[in-house]
């Protein structure tokens, strides 16, 4: 089963696409993190660690990246598998319900901060080129962020009223895992590693990351929960 997660992650990494969005050319959509999250929700910590290391190493080999791998990105892969595993193993149902409320509050706060950040900037540097962030673009981003929140909350309410207790626990874990990884790895660790390696300012890529998170959080929750439910049925 661990090998299946490694293969899926590598395939999805190779299928990453750069999507032009609102005139910006570098919104990279990639789903390789999702099999690692599902692995974390399915396997034990030791196996999750092996899956993450194997995925990172084989990804470098297939990409023909020479030299020693940067351990910061290896840590990213490990966290993407281990965070869901730790949530699964150490959270009681009572704590999950509390953390679900915390996730909603955090999403609201992050969305507001994202809107404030987008509102303050007038131009952004992407791949060495400067792009103007006009008022219509800002308004469109605000609408997208609001739509993402509405979709996420509707999705949570719909499934909470529909699922059995066992499936509801899996659903809670999917939400917590996707949001936790998006905040820790995508929004914090990755820009920090890029700053350490290439001198890219920490906040230089946050504009694009905010846009990406608006897409990836709802999409990630849906895919992770669906994949996990299918795997649980096969295992049983």
Per-region residue spans from a language model:
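Loop-helix junctions at membrane interfaces
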Residues: 1-236
């Amino acid at each position: 089963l661990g090998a299946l997660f490694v293969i899926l992650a590598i395939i999805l990494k190779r299928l990453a696409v750069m999507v032009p969005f609102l005139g910006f050319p570098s919104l990279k959509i990639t789903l390789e993190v999702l099999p690692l999250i599902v692995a974390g929700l399915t396997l034990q910590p030791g196996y999750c660690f092996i899956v993450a290391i194997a995925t990172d190493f084989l990804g470098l080999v297939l990409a023909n990246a020479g030299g020693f791998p940067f351990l910061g990105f290896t840590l990213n892969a490990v966290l993407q598998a281990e965070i869901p595993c730790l949530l699964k193993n150490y959270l009681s149902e009572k704590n999950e319900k509390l953390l679900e409320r915390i996730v909603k509050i955090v999403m609201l706060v992050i969305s507001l901060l994202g809107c404030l950040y987008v509102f303050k900037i007038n131009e952004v540097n992407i791949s060495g080129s400067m792009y103007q962030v006009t008022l219509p673009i800002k308004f469109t981003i605000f609408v997208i962020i609001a739509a993402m929140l509405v979709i996420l909350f509707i999705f949570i309410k719909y499934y909470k009223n529909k699922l059995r207790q066992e499936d509801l626990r899996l659903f809670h874990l999917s939400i917590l895992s996707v949001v936790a990884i998006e905040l820790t790895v995508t929004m914090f660790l990755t820009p920090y590693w890029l700053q350490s390696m290439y001198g890219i300012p920490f906040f230089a890529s946050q504009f694009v990351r905010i846009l990406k998170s608006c897409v990836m959080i709802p999409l990630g929750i849906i895919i992770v929960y669906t994949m996990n439910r299918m795997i649980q049925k096969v295992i049983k």
